[in-house]
């Protein structure tokens, strides 16, 4: 008993000595995590070089675009063919994908051989043979009469220019068919099929095996965005942001990049990591200096690396008592399968003994232990190097997405990964150590790259079908030149109706006289008070207008809030509160007791009977002060001033915010005769000839008309242009049937139109994977500011996704593109409709004056116009297009409607003084 224990201890000690001896000899092959992180950093730099337009030609890691723009989302369905060509045998598959609540993939396939004389014959012979095998397969399945979509896995070096266009760079794997290199392989297959004439197929996609692996696994796990192959060769692919792929136009969405990572190090970046054994393997290979990384990790070279180490250690008399055999000295005699067998847990040492005996050696126990350790070090290095480059890919995806923690799946195939007893486990552990902030799942591809080619095709078909369905819906929101001209014509008709005494009562576009009869001429001067009331806060302003050399406007203002109990109390309480705030402001400005002319911007629906008289028709915006509706707001204000008996004010003018905008801009530009607001709401005003304003006596001069154009279409004249989404938004609004034009163009409603379209798309499975979140059902979540942010040119889809996430909407990259497109279409239509309305206004001014050409400026305010990245540009283009005889400039109002009220007051005072003289 004691003797056997001593023998066991002796053996253990001998084994440990052998392991230490090997570890020392192969010190440079045992890579620390620090070294692996350095390799990962270098690989990230190589990835960037491959993606960059200027650095791509000289980059070792080529980062080739595959034109695969999306991974499966589980809703794919249909019947597809796949062709898998990458060696002396090739497979033809029929893949049926069903999506009836249960994802299912059914496959039938047949393997066909390619005789050597065809491999080395002409390209025509090769592709005719492939077409013949395809015909044979379709005959067997009795599907020749169908025109099925086909995906083609073509595992040779190619230059891909489209999803269905791939030019062979060079043959490998023993193929030498003439007349194929430099040609599009898809075109060659199509021509071979046409030559037969007995069937037809639709070749949708050509991919390599790595992409096929990612797509196969992507169907089972929608987080799969990386494909990895570690077999005879090694490569990886992943989904990259389009904005980083300089070789392909466009910066929205993602595209799968075929990395061709086997060439990492071909430019010398791994020289300090490569060992003498790596250099020897490279020197003896068919392609010296090429695919250096692949030669360190793939199955084609792993066994040979072990053989070279055994030879070197034997020569150094560290193994086999210094003896060599002819078999051990024969290149390729130690296979990668031998490495896997020796590393088996159960009988690895026994397997080592058998393999070494096969190689003509007479190994001792310690030789077998040493060989086992050599295999372990070589395969561990391979897994570690793979992990380092994968870590770089994961880090890049994480950076691209801007996530603190990435959750991702890697689809894997290849004999080394699948058959080596420990490779997969070592790879997984190393990846998790190198990128601890990534939750990585590894998913084995069980069905090969043929299924992957079919999945690429299925995804392409799904995307095309969904795109067609979405475009059909969005088409109803896209307006042609003729439709916009018709909107302009109808607006002009409605304007005439509103101006006419006979039809004014029934006209939706009310064309209200404002009694503002002139715009600033630059001679205005004096101090004026302005009051700007249009919400829960209001402003009191002191506006100092100077003329002559010191011409300009100086403003001081203070914002006051209106408590809810005052908003809902009596009219007296409301106007007493306003006067109290005016008194406070005058004291604040050191002007207590001073009497000044006052302009009053009052942004509620009113009927104006003179410049200083405005009857409140109804409260809006949450105001409910009693005793005000039907009363003149100027009188109510004056009565409150008299009750206070502290100061007196000369209320000269009461205006709405649109007129205020025109007057503010009119002070800067004498050509400004139109005011436009496109913000939460929308309205316009312009200077009309008095002879056309039938509601006011007098024929001479001009008067500003407040169009109240938001009600355009309330009589049904826009019904043919309104979509189901416009109708839905209108029906659920606070004022159904009212302000229909405003609901198609203003910021308050555009987000709701977008939300309704997104719900429709989601219900039809065209967005958010068909899952409607509670958040999406919430009215009002899409504020105008989000539309503006989403459409911003400088905003990447990453930020669009962040905005959607903030709204509680989990989206894919494809979803983000769709949401952005919907926002673009809705905002563009709004800008075009606004432009059509404005074209009607400026053309009317031109016709009023009998001019061939009109030069006019439009003063504009409103958040949608100012903050949306494209609204203003599209609106300007539309006006130019629809009113070619008008030279229209647009001037943004910078100081709001309060300054405008003061300027109207200043103009009125100027005219009044001139009349007195």
Curated annotation (Swiss-Prot):
Region (Hexokinase small subdomain 2): 521-655
Binding-site positions, ATP 2: 532-537, 680, 747-748, 784-788, 863-867
Keyword annotations: Acetylation, Allosteric enzyme, ATP-binding, Cytoplasm, Glycolysis, Kinase, Membrane, Mitochondrion, Mitochondrion outer membrane, Nucleotide-binding, Repeat, Transferase
UniProt region (Hexokinase large subdomain 2), positions on chain: 656-895
UniProt keyword Zinc, yes or no: no
Modification type N-acetylmethionine: residues: 1
Membrane topology: Peripheral membrane protein
Enzyme class (EC, first level): transferase
Gene Ontology CC, one term: centrosome
Activity regulation info: Hexokinase activity is specifically inhibited by 2,6-disubstituted glucosamines.
Chief place where the protein resides: mitochondrion
PROSITE patterns hit by this protein: HEXOKINASE_1 (PS00378), HEXOKINASE_2 (PS51748)
Hexokinase domain sequence ranges: 16-458, 464-906
Positions annotated to bind ATP 1: 30, 84-89, 425-426
Localisation: Mitochondrion outer membrane; Cytoplasm, Cytosol
The protein's annotated pathway: Carbohydrate metabolism; hexose metabolism; Carbohydrate degradation; glycolysis; D-glyceraldehyde 3-phosphate and glycerone phosphate from D-glucose: step 1/4
Domain of life: Eukaryota
Binding site for D-glucose 1: 155-156, 172-173, 208-209, 235, 260, 291-294
Region (Hexokinase small subdomain 1): 73-207
InterPro entries, per database record: ATPase_NBD (IPR043129), Hexokinase (IPR001312), Hexokinase_BS (IPR019807), Hexokinase_C (IPR022673), Hexokinase_N (IPR022672)
GO MF annotations in UniProt: ATP binding; D-glucose binding; fructokinase activity; glucokinase activity; hexokinase activity
Membership in a protein family: Belongs to the hexokinase family.
PANTHER family in the record: HEXOKINASE, HEXOKINASE-2
Protein name: Hexokinase-2
Gene name linked to the record: Hk2
């Amino acid at each position: 008993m004691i003797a056997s224990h001593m023998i066991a201890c002796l053996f253990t000690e001998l084994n440990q000595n052998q392991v230490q001896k090997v570890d020392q000899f192969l010190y440079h092959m045992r890579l620390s995590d620090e070294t692996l992180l350095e390799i990962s950093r270098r690989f990230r730099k190589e990835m960037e070089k491959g993606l960059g337009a200027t650095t791509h030609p000289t980059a070792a890691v080529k980062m080739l675009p595959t034109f695969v723009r999306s991974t499966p989302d589980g809703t794919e369905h249909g019947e597809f063919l796949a062709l898998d060509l990458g060696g002396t045998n090739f497979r033809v598959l029929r893949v049926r994908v069903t999506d009836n609540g249960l994802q299912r993939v059914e496959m039938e396939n047949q393997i066909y051989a390619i005789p050597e004389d065809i491999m080395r014959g002409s390209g025509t012979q090769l592709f005719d043979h492939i077409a013949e095998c395809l015909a044979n397969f379709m005959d067997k399945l009795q599907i020749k009469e169908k025109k099925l979509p086909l995906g083609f896995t073509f595992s040779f070096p190619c230059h891909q220019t489209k999803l269905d266009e791939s030019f062979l760079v060079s043959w490998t794997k023993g193929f030498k068919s003439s007349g194929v290199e430099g040609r599009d392989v898809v075109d060659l297959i199509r021509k071979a099929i046409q030559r037969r004439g007995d069937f037809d197929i639709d070749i949708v996609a050509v991919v390599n095996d790595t992409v096929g692996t990612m797509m196969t696994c992507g169907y089972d796990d929608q987080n799969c965005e990386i494909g990895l192959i570690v077999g005879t060769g090694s490569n990886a692919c992943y989904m990259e942001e389009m904005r980083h792929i300089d070789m392909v136009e466009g910066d929205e969405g993602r595209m799968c990049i075929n990395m061709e990572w086997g060439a990492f190090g071909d430019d010398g970046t791994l020289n300090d990591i490569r060992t003498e054994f790596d250099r020897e393997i490279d020197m003896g290979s068919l392609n010296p200096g090429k695919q250096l990384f692949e030669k360190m990790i793939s199955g084609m070279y792993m066994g040979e690396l072990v053989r070279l180490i055994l030879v070197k250690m034997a020569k150094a008399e560290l193994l086999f008592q210094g003896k060599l055999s002819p078999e051990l000295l024969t290149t390729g005699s130690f296979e990668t399968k031998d490495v896997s067998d020796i590393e088996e847990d159960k009988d690895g040492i026994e397997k080592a003994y058998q393999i070494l005996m096969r190689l003509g050696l007479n190994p001792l126990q310690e030789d077998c232990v040493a060989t086992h350790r050599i295999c372990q070090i070589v395969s561990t290095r391979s897994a570690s190097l793979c992990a380092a480059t994968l870590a770089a890919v994961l880090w890049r995806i994480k950076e691209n997405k801007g996530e603190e923690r990435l959750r991702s799946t890697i689809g894997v195939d290849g004999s080394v990964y699948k058959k080596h007893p420990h490779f997969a486990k070592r790879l997984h552990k190393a990846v998790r150590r190198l990128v601890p902030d990534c939750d990585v799942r590894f998913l084995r591809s069980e069905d090969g790259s043929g299924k992957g080619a079919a999945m690429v095709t299925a995804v392409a078909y799904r995307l095309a079908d969904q795109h067609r369905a979405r475009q059909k819906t969005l088409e109803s929101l896209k307006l042609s030149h003729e439709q916009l001209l018709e909107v302009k014509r109808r607006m002009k008709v409605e304007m005439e109706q509103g101006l006419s005494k006979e039809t004014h009562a029934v006209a939706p576009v009310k064309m209200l006289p404002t009694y503002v009869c002139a715009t600033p001429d630059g001679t205005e001067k004096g101090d004026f008070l302005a009051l700007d009331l249009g919400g829960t806060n209001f402003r009191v302003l002191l506006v100092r207008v100077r003329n002559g050399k010191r011409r300009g406007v100086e403003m001081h203002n203070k914002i006051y809030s209106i408590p809810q109990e005052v908003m809902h109390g009596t009219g007296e309480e409301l106007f007493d509160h306003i006067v109290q705030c005016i008194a406070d402001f005058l004291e604040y400005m050191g002007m207590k007791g001073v009497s000044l002319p006052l302009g009053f911007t009052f942004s509620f629906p009113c009927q104006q009977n003179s410049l200083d008289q405005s009857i409140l028709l109804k409260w809006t915006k949450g105001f409910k002060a009693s005793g005000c509706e039907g009363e003149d707001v100027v009188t109510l204000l004056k009565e409150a001033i008299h009750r206070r008996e502290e100061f007196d004010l000369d209320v000269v003018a009461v205006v709405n915010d649109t007129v205020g905008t025109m007057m503010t801009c009119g002070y800067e530009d004498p050509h400004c005769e139109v005011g436009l607001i496109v913000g939460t709401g929308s309205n316009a005003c312009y200077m009309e000839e008095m002879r056309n304003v039938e509601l006011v006596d007098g024929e001479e001069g001009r008067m500003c008309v407040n169009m109240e154009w938001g009600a355009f279409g309330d009589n049904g004249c826009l019904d043919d242009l309104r979509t189901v989404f416009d109708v839905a938004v209108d029906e659920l609004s606070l004022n159904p049937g009212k302000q229909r034009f405003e609901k198609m163009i203003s910021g308050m409603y555009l987000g709701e139109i977008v939300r309704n379209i997104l719900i429709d798309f989601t219900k039809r499975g065209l967005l958010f994977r068909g899952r409607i979140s509670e958040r999406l059902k919430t009215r009002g979540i899409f504020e105008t500011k989000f539309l503006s942010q989403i459409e911003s040119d400088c905003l990447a889809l990453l930020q669009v996704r962040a905005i959607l996430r903030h709204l509680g909407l989990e989206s894919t990259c494809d979803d983000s593109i769709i949401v952005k497109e919907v926002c673009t279409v809705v905002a563009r239509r709004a800008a075009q409709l606004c432009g059509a309305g404005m074209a009607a206004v400026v053309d009317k001014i031109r016709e009023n004056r009998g001019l061939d050409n009109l030069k006019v400026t439009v003063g504009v305010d409103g958040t949608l116009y100012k903050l949306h990245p494209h609204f203003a540009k599209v609106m300007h283009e539309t006006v130019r297009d629809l009113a070619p005889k008008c030279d229209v400039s647009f001037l943004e109002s910078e100081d709001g409607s309060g300054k405008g009220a003061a300027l109207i007051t200043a103009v009125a005072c100027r005219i009044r003084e001139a009349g007195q003289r």
